[in-house]
């Protein structure tokens, strides 16, 4: 059992983007900053939703206090999240699947650059 305790500090409903924006406090005395995965799992469990709809934007730790604040976006549908969230956030939250998405995006970008170079010549 970890020495972390979580608490939802604030919830904001963003109907335009079909998501909820949460501010989650993590108290972790004498322990390291909680991982994105542990925050995602806790939020998904608390809200009773699938973990694929939860994305941690950032975790900010207060030096020497054993307390962190995490900004979390919870989407109604994971397909909407993949369109709205930046690729680097997807890569950080989805692990291997996110890294594959990032690599595919880099390949597409490089292909576009090559195409532009060929047109200029």
From Swiss-Prot:
Name listed for the protein in its UniProt record: Small ribosomal subunit protein eS24
Organism annotation: Pyrobaculum aerophilum (strain ATCC 51768 / DSM 7523 / JCM 9630 / CIP 104966 / NBRC 100827 / IM2)
GO biological process, one term: translation
One GO cellular component, as annotated: ribonucleoprotein complex
Gene designation per UniProt: rps24e
Molecular function per GO: structural constituent of ribosome
Family membership noted in the UniProt record: Belongs to the eukaryotic ribosomal protein eS24 family.
Keyword set, alphabetical order: Ribonucleoprotein, Ribosomal protein
Keyword Ribosomal protein on entry: yes
UniProt cross-references to Pfam families, sorted A to Z: Ribosomal_S24e
């Amino acid at each position: 059992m970890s020495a972390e305790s979580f608490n939802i500090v604030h919830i904001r409903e963003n109907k335009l983007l079909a998501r909820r924006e949460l501010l989650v406090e993590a108290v972790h005395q004498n322990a390291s900053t909680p991982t994105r995965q542990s925050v995602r799992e806790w939020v998904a469990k608390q809200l009773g939703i699938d973990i694929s709809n939860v994305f941690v934007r950032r975790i900010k730790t207060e030096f020497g206090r054993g307390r962190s604040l995490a900004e979390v976006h919870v989407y109604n549908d994971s397909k909407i999240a993949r369109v709205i969230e930046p690729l680097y956030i997807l890569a950080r939250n989805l692990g291997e699947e996110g890294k594959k998405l990032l690599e595919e995006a880099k390949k597409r970008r490089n292909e576009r650059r090559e195409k532009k170079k060929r047109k200029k010549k």
